[in-house]
């Protein structure tokens, strides 16, 4: 949905009513796309918090797997807060100190009532939590590039977070860290960016989801094909 706000998608005002509301920043409380982002995002955050809460009880069984799970859960919690924040709050810089309202921060398990009553934190507080989770995940995630999240993905998201926060010095720092790692290179054939899929990774890919044919069943990939513009 953040791609809509960046004008990387076309929307049809008639057939893509909910998406068009997001693109023009005229959505209401009944917008299904926005509601889905909020509900699914916080559902993922809650699942990550549950794993993090119970992880100490089982980490002795397999310490390496426990470290990996902790890193992955911190990464998921961070990027979900980040994407929700970008959709439901004013951007960083709206106030000089980013004290304007952001979204609720959820980093622990609570009852449904407690979660519903969680107040909105400031944008600065949300960004600080996101950055803290990502920095911790970098220390826990592996360097290998496969279908699971790696430290490079956490670094790449830190680039995006700092850039969105208008902290360009730190954004540049993490961009340089990825570039200087020599783990990634630009594709010589630009068509490979769109033609390579599944286990056949693009050299440029830092973090991607692995899809199987059954993932086409909900029609979402078709929608992306029609809506996304190359940038």
Question: Where are each of the predicted segments found?
Answer:
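Conserved, well-structured interaction surfaces
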Residues: 14-88, 121, 136-142
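Hydrophobic-face positions in mid-chain alpha helices that act as interaction patches
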Residues: 172-229
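Short coil/linker segments at helix-helix boundaries
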Residues: 87-128
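Residues that flank catalytic or metal-binding motifs in active/ligand-binding sites
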Residues: 101, 150, 157, 202-205
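Acidic, glycine-rich segments characteristic of secretory precursors and extracytoplasmic regions
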Residues: 1-4
